[in-house]
């Protein structure tokens, strides 16, 4: 019988060893799980820490005020100057941070760029972990203050300039060239090395600015016009054909043409037809130093020759027109040094301007024209070569025009003529207001002479001219046309050079077209005396045109004790050239109240006396409608009501209590209550004497009691002078009241009025003058050669170029950080809109207005000396205020003002400087000119200038034999005399008879007669 087998289910107990091993295994499992969790958390924390800035970069900046001078090489990161200065500054920054509280976090630094303005440094700081910008700035300032770097012996850093810029970058690993992504300042872009920023307009300009050259990458810079950028080789082409604008914004296509050194470039245009807003600019050179040589639009310019081996061509597309063929240009290289004189001169303008070039220092450019000019009453109807509308000629700018201007055309340098040669040409001078055409010969020795000149209207025909040339040194020929505003076109054609002297001309000498007599008499009659109720008057022929060359006078009268308010109901004069002048009284030396010109409206004018003189003075060019005016009389018209006896009247008419006068707080809106609170009394010069303080309305003399060196310095500063030089007690017999001075704990002065001084001793103080009249950049190593010559850069750091409407018109002198002294006749009629003036400080070359040494400033206030008399040329001085103060540099410094009693004796050699014409009515200088001239006595000057009244307000200088003088364009500039190693402003260039003629000195406003008036603006 089978049986069934079962499995036993009985229980087996564990041994103690088994239990122990099981427990250990469980513990190990728990530990492993814990370690894994901790590791994960650590990794996450590490990632979070990196995200929070475990590696950190900050961008900072500061300004170096001394120890190094800015130069343009600092813009080039590859230059030795950049590398040396960057190395020294990085060493300085490293030393500061490695001795700071951030030494453990700090890694290194990198200088990015230098900017002009003393020297502004931009640099990056690298840290191992995140640091706040406040902490970075604080540690940097503390390190600079504590001189924590050996480099601070050399460099002085402006602590107020230290700042952390907006850029703050953090990364999760150390900064290396392979992974840093740089952020650039506004207006700049990064190079492909991701380490360097350069200005955006430096890309694709023909000059390498990025260390890796990526800013001139041919692929990146390829134009949308034809896909090209850099054109090399002896010939090539570029084009912009059928160029509809591809976007809403303007499009710029730019090409760089580069041929072998020593060669020049000829541009030819197979096709050229663009919309008038789409302009092709042709520049000589590349980069920031390129010079605009031609701007072309609409019609084919023919051939353009650029005398450089590099050309920049820039096509600006503004329109969205699609029916213009654009242009197709080719270029070829040529060697201009192989040209002879005849090839350089001969030109009929059928092939562009041939080898003639536009004068960059004139006021406008010659135009190449086919057919008639703009106006039917001036200029040719056709060229001279073919005598029909198919040929070309050149003309001064056509159209109505807006100003008087010189238009110059220059030859290439010509070789000395071994035998005489005849320069011939055809000229066209037709128009009622045609001025002048001249031919000048100049050489490298700055010698210039006029060899041909014609003035006036010669009718609507081409006239023949010729000049024999016989020069012994290299020279240039210059055609200069002087154009008036309208009806004054001058044209040239068929210029040629032939062997031998010029023979008698086969063509008759042209005769002037008689000038029609003026339609109206220039004498207005009068002067007209006007009394109430006959108070309305107007210019002659109003509202029709007033006469040219008019001089009209109205004298307005009121009863004694009253004054006059003049109101212009209508006003329309030719701007600048025609003026209404208003004076306070009838006498010739009455004060100038206003000069009005241009279109109205104009402000009312108030006299301070019971008489007012109104003058209308016009020139000989244009006339407009004139003016209609009326006047009223009354008591205190336009004058604020006088204040009560216990109040002070501010300059703006406000009244403030006398107790608030000179209390250290401004109560007048114009600040005049704190303007005149301390002065010298009984001194020998304007920087010494007894000290007086105004307390309320009473002047108190300072006691010697408790006087200290610090008080001397504080008082000198209040007086607008330098530090205290010396002080000593004196024992006068003068009565009080007196004032005792003490220094408060916070440094301000405490004034205590007193009826008596201790031991009756007063203080006599002498202050140092503020630093002025010092040359820092260009010291004279040898005595200057007497005669006009190019000045060194920085030789006259106070000489300022004054530009009006973009044209250098006058000079000026810097006398403080925000005030200039110039001539009144420069700004007369140009004073109503000061912002049209721009002062260029630190200027050396007119062709380089963007030099790092130059600083432009708009003018925001013009004050003509109220005693200025234009007709007598007396008191010819004016003040001009800069919109913003200027920082002094090696190239910008103030000149010293003379004492009121300072004498510059006759016979002393002083200096003049300016950019004016180098010959009378010739071309202006590009580089600042300087010369020495001897001073003359006023008696001698009066003998040599008998047609003028030489007053005590004038000083004269010049050689009896002539040859050296100020000239047109130098007006307003300085006459400078040196004393005790400082330069003083002795005179302001005013007037003369022509320029540099024998026994015809230059006349200058004598500045010592105006020192007090000038200083009233400075303090």
Curated annotation (Swiss-Prot):
<feature type="lipid moiety-binding region" description="N-myristoyl glycine">
    <location>
        <position position="2"/>
    </location>
</feature>
<dbReference type="GO" id="GO:0016020">
    <property type="term" value="C:membrane"/>
</dbReference>
<feature type="disulfide bond">
    <location>
        <begin position="941"/>
        <end position="956"/>
    </location>
</feature>
<dbReference type="InterPro" id="IPR000859">
    <property type="entry name" value="CUB_dom"/>
</dbReference>
<comment type="subunit">
    <text>Heterodimer of a catalytic (light) chain and a multidomain (heavy) chain linked by a disulfide bond.</text>
</comment>
<feature type="disulfide bond">
    <location>
        <begin position="184"/>
        <end position="197"/>
    </location>
</feature>
<feature type="domain" description="SRCR">
    <location>
        <begin position="678"/>
        <end position="771"/>
    </location>
</feature>
<feature type="disulfide bond">
    <location>
        <begin position="910"/>
        <end position="977"/>
    </location>
</feature>
<keyword id="KW-0472">Membrane</keyword>
<dbReference type="InterPro" id="IPR013320">
    <property type="entry name" value="ConA-like_dom_sf"/>
</dbReference>
<dbReference type="InterPro" id="IPR000082">
    <property type="entry name" value="SEA_dom"/>
</dbReference>
<feature type="glycosylation site" description="N-linked (GlcNAc...) asparagine">
    <location>
        <position position="534"/>
    </location>
</feature>
<dbReference type="InterPro" id="IPR009003">
    <property type="entry name" value="Peptidase_S1_PA"/>
</dbReference>
<dbReference type="InterPro" id="IPR035914">
    <property type="entry name" value="Sperma_CUB_dom_sf"/>
</dbReference>
<feature type="glycosylation site" description="N-linked (GlcNAc...) asparagine">
    <location>
        <position position="949"/>
    </location>
</feature>
<dbReference type="InterPro" id="IPR036772">
    <property type="entry name" value="SRCR-like_dom_sf"/>
</dbReference>
<dbReference type="Pfam" id="PF00089">
    <property type="entry name" value="Trypsin"/>
</dbReference>
<keyword id="KW-0325">Glycoprotein</keyword>
<keyword id="KW-0519">Myristate</keyword>
<feature type="disulfide bond">
    <location>
        <begin position="757"/>
        <end position="767"/>
    </location>
</feature>
<feature type="domain" description="Peptidase S1">
    <location>
        <begin position="785"/>
        <end position="1019"/>
    </location>
</feature>
<keyword id="KW-0735">Signal-anchor</keyword>
<keyword id="KW-0677">Repeat</keyword>
<feature type="active site" description="Charge relay system">
    <location>
        <position position="825"/>
    </location>
</feature>
<dbReference type="InterPro" id="IPR036055">
    <property type="entry name" value="LDL_receptor-like_sf"/>
</dbReference>
<dbReference type="InterPro" id="IPR023415">
    <property type="entry name" value="LDLR_class-A_CS"/>
</dbReference>
<dbReference type="InterPro" id="IPR000998">
    <property type="entry name" value="MAM_dom"/>
</dbReference>
<feature type="domain" description="LDL-receptor class A 2">
    <location>
        <begin position="641"/>
        <end position="679"/>
    </location>
</feature>
<keyword id="KW-0865">Zymogen</keyword>
<feature type="disulfide bond">
    <location>
        <begin position="662"/>
        <end position="677"/>
    </location>
</feature>
<dbReference type="InterPro" id="IPR001190">
    <property type="entry name" value="SRCR"/>
</dbReference>
<feature type="disulfide bond" description="Interchain (between heavy and light chains)">
    <location>
        <begin position="772"/>
        <end position="896"/>
    </location>
</feature>
<feature type="glycosylation site" description="N-linked (GlcNAc...) asparagine">
    <location>
        <position position="440"/>
    </location>
</feature>
<feature type="disulfide bond">
    <location>
        <begin position="650"/>
        <end position="668"/>
    </location>
</feature>
<feature type="glycosylation site" description="N-linked (GlcNAc...) asparagine">
    <location>
        <position position="470"/>
    </location>
</feature>
<dbReference type="Pfam" id="PF01390">
    <property type="entry name" value="SEA"/>
</dbReference>
<feature type="domain" description="MAM">
    <location>
        <begin position="342"/>
        <end position="504"/>
    </location>
</feature>
<dbReference type="GO" id="GO:0005903">
    <property type="term" value="C:brush border"/>
</dbReference>
<feature type="glycosylation site" description="N-linked (GlcNAc...) asparagine">
    <location>
        <position position="848"/>
    </location>
</feature>
<feature type="disulfide bond">
    <location>
        <begin position="191"/>
        <end position="210"/>
    </location>
</feature>
<dbReference type="GO" id="GO:0006508">
    <property type="term" value="P:proteolysis"/>
</dbReference>
<feature type="domain" description="CUB 1">
    <location>
        <begin position="225"/>
        <end position="334"/>
    </location>
</feature>
